[in-house]
From Swiss-Prot:
SUPFAM superfamilies: Thiolase-like. The active site is at C119, H252, N282. It is an enzyme of class 2 (transferase). The lineage of its organism: Bacteria, Pseudomonadati, Pseudomonadota, Betaproteobacteria, Burkholderiales. The keyword rRNA-binding does not apply. It is found in: Cytoplasm. Keywords: Acyltransferase, Cytoplasm, Fatty acid biosynthesis, Fatty acid metabolism, Lipid biosynthesis, Lipid metabolism, Multifunctional enzyme, Transferase. Its main location: cytoplasm. This is Beta-ketoacyl-[acyl-carrier-protein] synthase III. Pathway: Lipid metabolism; fatty acid biosynthesis. It catalyses: malonyl-[ACP] + acetyl-CoA + H(+) = 3-oxobutanoyl-[ACP] + CO2 + CoA. Homodimer. Belongs to the thiolase-like superfamily. FabH family. The last Arg residue of the ACP-binding site is essential for the weak association between ACP/AcpP and FabH.
């Protein structure tokens, strides 16, 4: 019998501290950095973001999202036989955030590892879990995107510090005899490393080089809109579908302009696009599962619908997954 994988539960978590654009602008003003709600909304569509407390790590946020996904799936931690965490802000250099989260969750013993593909991380992680389930290597996987990007922001750079927030999203992906994930498409091009990066590295116990996020916004936008369309069309072709078949586009929640461009290229109304970036900003690898969970819990996205998930991030990395919920 051919094996497939299906999402059976979703979950998400945002830390309690919420900063509106006006809140953030007031804090930045004390450091001599000027911005405003109008400036941020016009360029990004972001109205608020959440920042984790200093003692809270990616594994803590991921743990809460994982628990909610397990509850939604009617599963227990002990049922999980694979944990993949997508993060660019790990708790430690090593061991992996997945191992740390595994112990907190009480799912010890199964394979657990991190995937680092920045904002494409959840797409990469979901695709890996799907492949492992299809080969019989796992039956019930926990796939998590978790980030504390507030730790790596340069709050003197108004072009980047207003964009990002902290959060986590998770799904339970289970073996099924009916297709859930229909196709995936993953890519990377390392020649674009410099347009979105944190160039510091650990050596001899010290962080060497610049430890904070750097981004060439116009270059990222130009590249993103092209590669996202390529990935979207690739998964549709692999699954024998067309853009007209899509019920919902759930893109990486980076910038409303990129999402509008993606929808326009696919000839989709924005009414078919799940948008949550206004509420939590760019949460990197957490953004797609956050948006998916919000849409499922609100009743907007329903079982049986065709979803196109797409992400793009530093590396440069990008990809898409087409699935029936």
């Amino acid at each position: 019998m051919k094996l497939y994988s299906r999402i059976t539960g979703t979950g998400s978590y945002l830390p309690p501290r919420r900063l509106t654009n006006s809140d953030l602008a007031a804090e930045l003003a004390t450091q001599g950095v000027e911005t405003s709600d109008d400036w941020i909304v016009e360029r990004t569509g972001i109205r608020a973001r959440h920042f984790a407390a200093p003692e809270v790590c990616s594994s803590d946020l991921g743990l809460e999202a994982a628990r909610r996904a397990l509850q939604a799936a009617g599963a227990k931690a002990q049922d999980i036989d694979l944990i993949i965490v997508a993060t660019s802000t790990p708790d430690m250099v090593f061991p992996s955030t997945a191992c740390i989260l595994q112990d907190k969750l009480g799912a010890n013993g199964c394979p657990a590892f991190d995937v680092q593909a920045v904002c494409s991380g959840f797409i990469y992680a979901l695709s890996i879990a799907d492949a492992m389930i299809k080969t019989g290597a796992a039956k019930k996987a926990l796939v998590i995107g978790a980030e504390v990007f507030s730790r790596i922001l340069d709050f003197k750079d108004r072009t980047t510090c207003v964009l990002f927030g902290d959060g986590a999203g998770a799904v339970v992906l289970e073996a099924s005899d009916t297709p859930g994930i229909l196709a995936s498409d993953l890519h990377a091009d390392g020649k674009h490393v410099g347009i979105l990066c944190v160039p510091g590295h650990v050596s001899g116990g010290n962080v060497l080089g610049a430890p904070l996020l750097q981004m060439d916004g116009p270059a990222v936008f130009k590249l993103a809109v092209g590669v996202l369309d390529e990935a979207a069309r690739a998964v549709l072709a692999k699954a024998g579908k067309t853009a007209a078949d899509i019920d919902w586009l759930i893109p990486h929640q980076a910038n409303i302009r990129i999402m509008q461009s993606s929808a326009r290229k696919l000839k989709l109304s924005m009414d078919k696009v799940v948008v949550t970036v206004d509420q939590h900003g760019n949460t990197s690898a957490a953004s797609i599962p956050l948006a998916l969970d919000a849409a499922v819990r609100s009743g907007k996205v329903k079982a049986g619908e065709l979803l196109l998930l797409e992400g793009v991030g530093g590396g440069f990395t990008w990809g898409a997954v087409l699935l029936n919920l």
